Amino acid sequence: MTTLIRRGRRAEEGQERRADSEDSIKDKDEEDSADSKEIRLTLMEEVLLLGLKDKEGYTSFWNDCISSGLRGGILIELFLRGRVVLEPATIRKKRLTDKKVLLKSDKLTGDVLLDETIKHMKATEPAETVQSWIELLTGETWNPFKLQYQLRNVRERIAKNLVEKGILTTEKQNFLLFDMTTHPVTNTTEKQRLVKKLQESLLEKWVNDPHRMDKRTLALLVLAHSSDVLENAFSSLSDEKYDMAMIRSKELLDLEPDTEGTKPNACEMIWAVLSAFNKS
């Protein structure tokens, strides 16, 4: 009799454990499902989204930094996807701005801007530095033979990707003497998620060590600053939190790239891009 009772209890305990296990699996599936609903954006798309005026659908006419910032985003995105690396340091080439960008893999990504850049790099001999590539992709070169490397209509092509992902829409607006295609934000939830991520990285989730930060978040902070759109992400903050976010972002961006780029777990390309913008 006692044996039967024990077996019955074991059976009940086993059922409870299975039920708990099934609940935990269900919870994990729900979390995965929630994660899968998040739209995957490239760094270039995130920078442009931060720079766009929500209702007007265009970037500030006074912003002359975003073009080069988007090109820097292309280089970091290629690095994070394993397509490019920086050449190893030598006695003569210790500084990040002196290192050449080497093509690690010419496998295409499916993103037109990234793939166009891969093709340019594959056809370039000798290799170029990070700063040179930013200038070439922007078209800021005095060498007429290298104008072919300029990426054209970059903002419009990135905006088109965001339209396809359901974040922007396309409209025509009349500006006195000309019509302009604009891309107002329709998915404000996605932009708010992006803004919240940047705010939290400098406030609630501040780690005071760039090498412990998520690499894509660190890259976005660098690119948003270089593109002069970082303050856009802080406009909704209270004065106290705004000041704190600005102080911490300045501390982060004032770090010496050549020193940070050699530390363990450092993402060299992020610091190389920051160094290139500091130098320009």
UniProtKB/Swiss-Prot annotation:
UniProt-annotated location(s): Golgi apparatus, Golgi stack membrane; Golgi apparatus, trans-Golgi network membrane
Pfam families: GPP34
GO BP: any one term: Golgi organization
Span list, region Beta-hairpin required for oligomerization: 171-182
Signal peptide range in chain numbering: none
Protein name: Golgi phosphoprotein 3-like B
Annotated keywords: Golgi apparatus, Lipid-binding, Membrane
Compositionally skewed regions (Basic and acidic residues) per UniProt: 10-32
Subunit note: Homooligomer.
Domain of life: Eukaryota
Protein purpose: Phosphatidylinositol-4-phosphate-binding protein that may play a role in the process of vesicle budding at the Golgi and anterograde transport to the plasma membrane.
Membrane topology per record: Peripheral membrane protein
GO MF entry, a single one: phosphatidylinositol-4-phosphate binding
Binding site for a 1,2-diacyl-sn-glycero-3-phospho-(1D-myo-inositol 4-phosphate): W62, R71, R152, R155
Family, similarity comment: Belongs to the GOLPH3/VPS74 family.
Cellular component annotations (GO), alphabetically ordered: cytosol; Golgi cisterna; Golgi cisterna membrane; Golgi membrane; trans-Golgi network
Stretches the record annotates as Disordered: 1-32
